[in-house]
Amino acid sequence: MSYRMMLLAFVPLFSAVVGDGGCPVSQNKMGRENTEWSISYAFHMTDENRNLPRVLLVGDSICNGYQEGVRKLTDGRCNVSYWVSSYCVTRPEYLRLLEFYLDDSEYAVIHFNNGLHSTRTETPKWASALSDVFRLIRDKQPKAKIVWATSTPLKSAEKSVKVRELNEAASEVVRNLGGIVVNDLYSLLDPFDREEYWSDMYHHKMNLRQKEAEQVATTVLSILPASPSAELRK
C-alpha cells in the first residue's frame, strides 16, 4: 500500500491523536490550544488502485479513531485520504491548511467535521467560519459531494450542551447552503453508556469507534458516484 504523509506538528501527548487518551481541548483560549497538531495520510496515490474514487475525511481525534475502520470497510471501492487536527475553523490558518488538502487530489466525497476543539469558541463566530469552510470546499472541489458529520457527545452530559449547540448551529448553516448530506454521529453515539463506551471525556473505546466507522463508511458509499454497491466489506 502506497501512501504519503504530512505531519505538521508532532504531539508529545500522542494519545490525543490516536483517540485513546487525554485531549488538550481544555486549554483552548481564543480559539487556540497550547498544543496544536495536524496529521494527514493519502493512500493509494501511485499503485494499481489509484484510479478509484477518492474520499477525504476531515476532522479531529474522533475522526482519527474511525478512519482506519472506514478504510477497511471501503477497501476496493474508494481510496480514503484523511486530515485530522486540533484547529478550530475560526483560526486564520485553518482555511490555508484545508486548502492544501483540497488542492492535493480530486475528491468524489468530502466527509467533514469540526467542533470538539471549538467548545470554548463563540457559537456565532464558529458558525460563520464553518459556512466559509463549506464555500471553500465547493469552490475548490465543485464535483465533490459534501457530508457534514455532527460532533459526538462528551462523557459529561453537562459539557455536551455546548456540543449540541454547535451541532444545531451547523445544522442551520447546512440548511441555508443546501445540498450537504448530514451524518448524525451525535445521535448514533448518544444512547450508549458513557462509563462502558467512553475512554475519557472525549474519546471512545474500540467497539464504539467501529460503529462510527460503519456509519461513516455506509454514508460515503451511499453517495459515491458509480459505486457498484453500498454494502460494506466484511
Regions found by a protein language model. Name each.
Residues 153-234:
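Catalytic His-Asp segment of secreted/periplasmic serine-dependent ester chemistry enzymes
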Residues 111-117, 134-168, 189-192:
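Active-site segments of SGNH/GDSL-like serine hydrolases
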Residues 1-6:
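Bacterial N-terminal signal peptides that target proteins for export
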Residues 23-132, 155-157, 161-164, 203:
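Conserved SGNH/GDSL esterase-like catalytic core that processes O-acyl groups on lipids
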Residues 103-105, 140-141, 223:
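Glycine-rich phosphate-binding loop signature in dinucleotide/nucleotide-binding domains
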Residues 15-21:
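Boundary at the C-terminal end of the N-terminal hydrophobic targeting segment
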Residues 79-81, 145, 179-181:
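Conserved beta-strand segments of alpha/beta enzyme cores
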Residues 8-15:
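Bacterial N-terminal signal peptides
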